Amino acid sequence: MALLRSLSAQRTAISLVYGRNSSKSSNSVAVAACRSFHQRGSGSTSIAGEGAASESTRGVNGARFLHSGDRPLQASTLVQPEVVSSETVKRSMKQESSQEKNPSPAGSPQRDPLDVSFNDPIAAFKSKTTGELIRAYLVYMICSSEKLVEHNMTLMKLARNLLGQKLFVLLMKSSFYGHFVAGENRHTIVPALERLRSFGVKPILDYSVEEDITQEEAEKREVESSVSSAGDKKEEGSMPQYHVDKSFADRRYKVSSARTYFYLNEATCERNMEIFIKCLEAVSDDDRKAPRAVATGATFGTGITAIKLTALGRPQLLLQLSEVIMRTRKYMEDMVGGQGNVLTHHKTIKDLEKYYATLGDNKDVKEFLNNVTSDKEGILHLFPWSGIVDEDSQLSDTFRVPDPQTGQMRRLISQIPPKEEEMFRNMIRRLNTIVKAAADLDVRIMVDAEQTYFQPAISRITLEMMRKYNKDKAIVFNTYQCYLRETFREVNTDLEQAKRQNFYFGAKLVRGAYMDQERDRAKSLGYPDPVNPTFEATTDMYHRTLSECLRRIKLMKDCDDDARKIGIMVASHNEDTVRFAIQQMKEIGISPEDKVICFGQLLGMCDYITFPLGQAGYSAYKYIPYGPVEEVLPYLSRRAQENKGVLKKIKKEKRLLLSEIRRRLMRGQLFYKPKGNYVPI
């Protein structure tokens, strides 16, 4: 009873009920802010151009209404416990008991106060049976052993050989597989999705089957698929990071938290497309639109599917396209000065005509200028990307620019053979098919970030998919890795494009998955390290980027604009970052019901963050892997490796698990059956 009183007292003392900030700006300030927001000048939206370096070093000082400082917020800044009397403790215990015995009636969804210290084991694990808690504790105990984790794949294969298939599958379902994976197929995962939803949490589905291939095979496939049949020509001005290097051909090197696809052939890419579409159907609630879907209403149109572009096409094409994008930026910088994306220079077609004036009446230059993407505020892109994503442009003919000295058209991409042009159109066709299916099924797509040598192409294509499909709501989301030095600038640029082309912008913010690999590759190939120097710098990048998104959302709300034109997922296992986001929302008057901010964590990790958020009415997601036991072993191996690297988080999760197991034993709840009455936002 002493332990129970202690837990109840702690929970009562530090609970924080979300209160929307009711303070309003004066009309004159709001009008001024609206004018500033709708201005398209260089200073109106904090787009990082020539002053990016100073902006990066000083944080978001221009938006101090968002937060009191640039350092991560501690729980103490959000929760100020008061002295709790014994009567309050008894009342809290009585309320807890009453909730368990008499949940809210149907039609009256339950909402709990949020403990932003994330120290409440009851809120964290009320969706779990006691057996599941014991399993989780044992899994984390194993993840705490470096030797076991280091050789986990070898041990799993050994167990498979010794036990045979049936016993091995039973063992895995009782341990790692049961903890980290929802089920074997889209039918067997339905109970897990329904239970998640009943406790306020929504799914991001991912079919997590991975090939278990050797390093030698991975390197062979990557080298073959990353070089054109015309050869790997490194012309003048080429950039080494966008060419394959055998030393880093196995893209799994030092990567534990992301899946890797290796290109085999076009048929494999077609199968991957079909798998992604099946994921969409699995999260769709509308059986009339998806007759093969499991019509349970388990996600009610709020589900998400994650995809990777490297699963849909030949990586060589993404490498070449990424190099084109970066060489285009360099071309523009050399011509007009400054740094950054083309649209950040705020140049017009007339400005370009002046630059090319010395070339005279040049037919090729005129044709080039006719194809430049621009609006009344200036140039957005030098190339017609809309034609590229609509599958009606030839890459070799598209990416040419006038030489300012000679007037001759200069290729920014080497001549692509017709067969590879067709492969690129196939990749774009597959992506269009997936996104169109998502739009028809009312399911969102999150395009995962990948290595920096692929990312310029991935982001460019994803933004064009947003422009094409995010006309009425955010269907397509891009992923931004905050361990990269350029993330703040890139997000600002993409937000500006979304505003100017009037489409809904969706972003998933993550810390990143490829840090060690990126650093080693940059050092080996001799290009600048793209990664932030410290953990703290990455945290600052995450918080500044999130703050800028929230600043723009606030301005849209103040101007009676549709604030849902910007949607952000805070995909983080970092408590300080989650607290920071909650505090920002509260301070500037963004409520969970506004549906512009959501939170996400992996299944089997940080339940003490996800479930309290969902039960308090925030939009909370779990990344839900599924697939046959023996085919998800590489995924399980990576989860074990990732948990080894976050021992501090494991320590807290183990402590909370043990606390809840003891509480249930003391209260005779060994056979507790989870039953929730929460409705996700």
Curated annotation (Swiss-Prot):
* Entry's localization field: Mitochondrion matrix
Task: Cite the Gene3D superfamilies for this sequence.
Answer: 3.20.20.220
Q: Which cofactor(s) are needed, names only? A: FAD
SUPFAM superfamilies assigned: FAD-linked oxidoreductase
Map out region (Disordered) in residue numbers.
Answer: 76-113, 216-239
Q: Which GO molecular function, any one, fits this protein according to its record?
A: proline dehydrogenase activity
Per its UniProt record, what InterPro entries does this chain match? FAD-linked_oxidoreductase-like, Proline_DH_dom, Proline_oxidase
GO CC, sorted alphabetically, is:
mitochondrial matrix; mitochondrion
- List the catalytic activities from the record: L-proline + a quinone = (S)-1-pyrroline-5-carboxylate + a quinol + H(+)
| GO BP annotations, alphabetical order | aggressive behavior; locomotory behavior; phototaxis; proline catabolic process; proline catabolic process to glutamate
Composition bias, kind Polar residues: at what positions? 76-87
Q: Where is it expressed, tissue-wise?
A: Most abundant in developing nervous system.
Transit peptide (first-last residue): 1-30
Q: Which domain of life is it from?
A: Eukaryota
Pfam families annotated for this entry?
A: Pro_dh
Annotated pathway, please?
A: Amino-acid degradation; L-proline degradation into L-glutamate; L-glutamate from L-proline: step 1/2
Q: What is its main location?
A: mitochondrion
Tell me the function of this protein.
Answer: Converts proline to delta-1-pyrroline-5-carboxylate. Involved in the conversion of proline to glutamate, which functions as a transmitter at neuromuscular junctions. Glutamate deficiency could possibly account for reduced motor activity.
Can you tell me which family this protein belongs to? Belongs to the proline oxidase family.
**Entry's PANTHER family?**
PROLINE DEHYDROGENASE 1, MITOCHONDRIAL, PROLINE OXIDASE
What name does UniProt use for this protein?
Proline dehydrogenase 1, mitochondrial
Organism for this UniProt entry: Drosophila melanogaster
Ranked from the top, the taxonomy reads:
Eukaryota, Metazoa, Ecdysozoa, Arthropoda, Hexapoda
